């Protein structure tokens, strides 16, 4: 079961789902600028206190896309959505490059 969840998470990472929408600012650019970071729960979050509207929209769209994909995988595997999201979140944190932000289990933003 755990193997199946990890495989599903890996497939999600490879699916291109995390490339971000076609905003003026991509998800990767927002991460590189320290505006957005990965959360351990499998979603992205806003790092800065007063983000531009485009950043808020980007985060909302990416999280909606992720939630849909997590739900699809969870239904296929017969596991809770949270389990799929958590495993994917752990993988995303592992892949976060040095200098970018992530929120750990305590919810605080840290620079890797």
Segments (PLM) and residue ranges:
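Bacterial N-terminal signal peptides that target proteins for export
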Residues: 1-9
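Anionic, Ser/Thr-rich low-complexity intrinsically disordered regions
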Residues: 2-3, 22-112
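Bacterial N-terminal signal peptides
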Residues: 8-19
